[in-house]
Amino acid sequence: MHLLKVGTWRNNTASSWLMKFSVLWLVSQNCCRASVVWMAYMNISFHVGNHVLSELGETGVFGRSSTLKRVAGVIVPPEGKIQNACNPNTIFSRSKYSETWLALIERGGCTFTQKIKVATEKGASGVIIYNVPGTGNQVFPMFHQAFEDVVVVMIGNLKGTEIFHLIKKGVLITAVVEVGRKHIIWMNHYLVSFVIVTTATLAYFIFYHIHRLCLARIQNRRWQRLTTDLQNTFGQLQLRVVKEGDEEINPNGDSCVICFERYKPNDIVRILTCKHFFHKNCIDPWILPHGTCPICKCDILKVLGIQVVVENGTEPLQVLMSNELPETLSPSEEETNNEVSPAGTSDKVIHVEENPTSQNNDIQPHSVVEDVHPSP
């Protein structure tokens, strides 16, 4: 017995995953945009009596919208315990030793833009913002509103706290801020996430479509095998020519349950394994998609040795067979392959048996002639 497994796989066009890849590519334009960071080269001088100690280095980073230019002045923190300068009434004690001064403000409490606005309204030429406690000397480029001709720099918490405490002890501290090196940051966390997601998505689509392609090829081979087996085994069903005097053409005789027409002389009928017979041109298109007898629902294909297993979630066998084998064993082809010469007034019934093909697909039909004496 031939055991065939039948399933359908709907092949999606390549445009679906190409569209998804295009969307990912468009999203990547924002993720892959280079991030430019300008470092601040600072020369900090500590005036202690007649001594001046200087400290040089790239200790800060310019804000995103900061003016990139050189600026110098005395560092002045806000008065009072609160050093975030979020209050518009914040007071800065300007030094009498310099016309230009730089506001030293602690991060937090409000936006960077609000801090810068308060300091510039008080006359600051630049703003130095130091990070919150617990961050060490970590810095990052701040996002803030652009202020004309105002330099905005961030320094680490340790350095900012050190400067603040020295100023509170009466040490005069000045700073010269110059534009340092430019850093282009390509590999940020957005880009890394995008690369990981894109790689995983592309790998999924590639393996998914390769898998679907392999399944489609296997399915096509199964259908070809099923078609061949049906052609070979369907020939085992007998053909008969209805003649004058047969009981089928009597007024009380049966009619074909498919076309509802009575049998006439010289009609070719096919006899199923359950002994029911029908017009050959009616039963052949029926038996292929249905596989059962129209009267008793006998599984003709199973009796002939073909068992069709339909997987869960697939279309019914009737739809599959009608779609895949629309021309298989059509009435015209059957009549060509199994030509039966109707007998005129002969008293012989001709049974034409179609043997299944051998491995080389050579069909060897043979006829069996039997003497039949009509009833008086």
UniProtKB/Swiss-Prot annotation:
It is a single-pass membrane protein. One of its GO terms (cellular component) is late endosome. Its EC number is 2.3.2.27. The chain crosses the membrane at residues 190-210. Pathway: Protein modification; protein ubiquitination. One of its GO terms (biological process) is protein autoubiquitination. It is an enzyme of class 2 (transferase). Residues 355-364 have a biased composition (Polar residues). A zinc finger (RING-type) spans 256-297. GO terms for molecular function: ubiquitin protein ligase activity; zinc ion binding. Keywords: Endoplasmic reticulum, Membrane, Metal-binding, Transferase, Transmembrane, Transmembrane helix, Ubl conjugation, Ubl conjugation pathway, Zinc, Zinc-finger. Gene3D superfamilies: 3.50.30.30, Zinc/RING finger domain, C3HC4 (zinc finger). Residues 65-167 form the PA domain. Expression is testis-specific. It is found in: Endoplasmic reticulum membrane. It comes from the Eukaryota. Residues 327-376 are annotated as: Disordered. It catalyses: S-ubiquitinyl-[E2 ubiquitin-conjugating enzyme]-L-cysteine + [acceptor protein]-L-lysine = [E2 ubiquitin-conjugating enzyme]-L-cysteine + N(6)-ubiquitinyl-[acceptor protein]-L-lysine. Interacts with E3 ligase UBE2J1. This is E3 ubiquitin-protein ligase RNF133. It comes from Homo sapiens.
